[in-house]
Amino acid sequence: MSNITIIINTPKTKSAGITIMVNQFETVSSAKEKYYKEAGSRINNQWLYDGAVLKDGDNFNNIGIEDKDIIEAHPSSKGGH
């Protein structure tokens, strides 16, 4: 069971982004909860529904930071960012 790194890019705040680790089979709802704790912001998920299983390449739109900010899921095994 591999982990997925979700990177929240925040160009508006000139941040390198916020990274949270989630299990490959975690749900969108669970990932949102982790993000709330890390960033205190809100994820408005336009492509997946709560309860959907996360997979490599899933994209989220982070309305809480800026409309066009993108959250990308990558396998953590690739390393780096």
Predicted regions and their residues:
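Ubiquitin system architectures
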Residues: 1-81
